[in-house]
Amino acid sequence: MKNEQIIDGYSVSLPNFLTVTAGNDTSLRKIDLPVMTARGVEHIYLTEKELSKHVLALGGIGSGKTNLIDLLVSQIVSSITPEDVVVIFDTKGDFLKKFGKPGDIVFGNLTSLPNGIESAKWNIYRDVTIDEEHINENLLEVCKTLFLDRSLHNNNPFFPNAARDLLYGVMIANIRSNDKEILNNQALLQYFQALDIEKLRELLSKYKDLKSCQYYIEGKNVQTQGVVSEVVQLVREVFIDKFALVGNTSIRECVRNKGKKIFIEYDLGIGNTLAPIYRLLLDMVLKEALCRDSQRGNVYIVIDEFSLLPNLQHIADGVNFGRELGVKIIAGLQNIEQMYEAYGEYSAGSILSGFNTRFFFKVNDSCSRKYIQELLGTNRQIYSFQSSEKQKGFIEQVYTGYVVEDWVYEKLPIGAALFHQNGKIPVIIGLPEFTGLGNQPLNTFAIQSTTRDTDSNQTKGFKRIN
């Protein structure tokens, strides 16, 4: 006979489900999420205050993350007000199909969109000049973002950094010319496609503060060729198709105007090539949300695959300081290592710590399990068993264990997750299945009361209940 008893702390285990806690004030509830526990159907209520502390869904491929985000987004878009804006970074086009409708704003390179929905014609200059008093700072930030990957992953960062300054010089000179005919993506692309270095030097020489940029392209030498080829290559790569038009749409202005859904459609086929543009678009959404002069309304930012947008310049501020400005981030992540690789271990840890509401689905890598176990902490347990030598009787051993042991995670089925909020005891839940906007979710995923047979050291599995 064996027996385990917690003497310090608590444990999340399959037979001991904990009641889902919920706020009592129904007027403040933004999300009403029915879930299944061993006690039956209960509800997770998320208020606007709790959403302002952000939501993270962590889990492997096919574990149920997107289903959860669908359930959350469906309730958010159903209650959007003229003071709110919802921005969705859509990696597979699924969110646009599920939640898009005529009048929504779509930024992306997709050639085929659902009926009645048109792609916005983005104008990079409009986003730079939206704040007349901060044009210089805005442009510096835009150029830094566009060249970030090249600067970080180049053995000789001089060339991408010089090319960045050159792009800044051309764009700021164009802005100062006040010639509206050249203040668009198409004109910028055409300028660099037919670049004449002598005319470029002449353009930069018109302004004293841009003369330093001329040093990069002095003479006909290897340095000049390297810098010019770097900037031309980037412009040709990122300003293509839908992003190379004579547009007039500013994504920051769309956020500022509110009352809309904005979709940033990621093109998986050329995602790595266009990564600087997608990063720039989402960074400007975050920047606009953090620079709002009014706290009225909410800015919901949904990121289905967090790791596809490494090095977002404003994500840490958005997570840690956006709460008072109505910023509410819902992010999906496949594993923790992706965040460590994208942002570095310490920066990633700081960003992840800003998410107060967490849904941990089944993960398949040790790094993610370790992160979850260390986040939830340890407990002390007494393990009692009958000695094989009868004269010794019962033997008790005290050991330290994790709140969530590996065997618990091994048995999580698709659609089940560990729900955790700071300051509250975590609970294992089964989520319903999203069936479409306006439809009641199906209680497809449910959890039967499950026990661990300590005598045989085996675990009985979950039962799927419809």
Q: Where on the chain are the PLM-derived regions?
A:
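N-terminal accessory nucleic-acid engagement/regulatory domains that precede
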Residues: 1-16
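P-loop NTPase motor domains
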Residues: 2-6, 21, 27, 34-42, ...
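Conserved ATP-driven motor cores of ASCE-family P-loop NTPases powering translocation/secretion/packaging/pilus
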Residues: 319-321, 325-421
